[in-house]
């Protein structure tokens, strides 16, 4: 069992999954080359191989369901290539079935031998899969009524889709014994540390350009008194600097205005006035009109902000090294330009080398850690959550976790 907030989530170890027929919901949704239709990244596909191997080890037969893209989009393609890649990573043949609930798919599922694995076609070919509704409603959907009688258990390994409330994600737990897969378990276990008050001090390093999303996270952290310090970078830091009454110079104010962020200043000021432990950079790396880069104090900026400065790096790093939990979401600077990656790289390195447990929101951030640094997987978690991670940090309920908890309540008789 995993406990997160007030939810109890069963894991595959809590179900007697031995020689059973298991429906496994995974999330292999991957970026696709528009010209060739080929997958550009298979990291999500590879991640799920662990859960499949564990279920096969116990003699279970597995039917995989997942989605890829949305109808009408360039990345809305078949799951055939996904099944081939999964076969490679699992080390066993995974048969692709070009059907979902038709007679062909039903026959294949019924005839599946122990330790056999098949993958059904893109679940979003079914129009009802695009409907967002409560688990109780989806439990009565055609998909669930058609497939659930064919299985002994349902396992959901799709944390990256946990913010969706669609039939294949939340409908089955009300009609089948259900549990979280290993990918889901790792994600939820890691994130549960964020709201565990014993794991303190907690440092949140929040940057990037998604300012409105980040403000929601900060508001939730303030409400629940979770963060000991919130270290800001990127446009988030610029917004809080303005909210503090600091003049960032005409160019930087223009950037904030062009992005429509000045309207958020009163909201940011309210957070500062609440006494929230929000830190802003004391210096920045800026780009001048002649493309020269300089380090300038926050109180006297001439150039355009591109990264946090050395003094800020040292200050932020000292906070990070004293923490028990570090959550990093969003870069400190314009990382698309090699010249402005230093702040993000330095803080990532401090976190990974420090004593605390590290949660990195967004796999792209991990690529900036120096390759010479040994990453201890027991203390560093790279979340694949995306939208689910954002909503979790912002205090929103995740329908997939709610449905798995509901399954546990129904089957255990507890609440």
UniProtKB/Swiss-Prot annotation:
One of its GO terms (cellular component) is cytosol. It catalyses: (2R)-3-phosphoglycerate + ATP = (2R)-3-phospho-glyceroyl phosphate + ADP. GO terms for molecular function: ADP binding; ATP binding; phosphoglycerate kinase activity. Coiled coil: none annotated. It comes from the Archaea. Substrate binds at residues 27-29, 44, 67-70, 124, 164. Its EC number is 2.7.2.3. Its main location: cytoplasm. Keywords: ATP-binding, Cytoplasm, Glycolysis, Kinase, Nucleotide-binding, Transferase. The keyword Nucleotide-binding applies. One of its GO terms (biological process) is glycolytic process. It holds the Pfam family PGK. This is Phosphoglycerate kinase. It comes from Sulfolobus acidocaldarius (strain ATCC 33909 / DSM 639 / JCM 8929 / NBRC 15157 / NCIMB 11770).
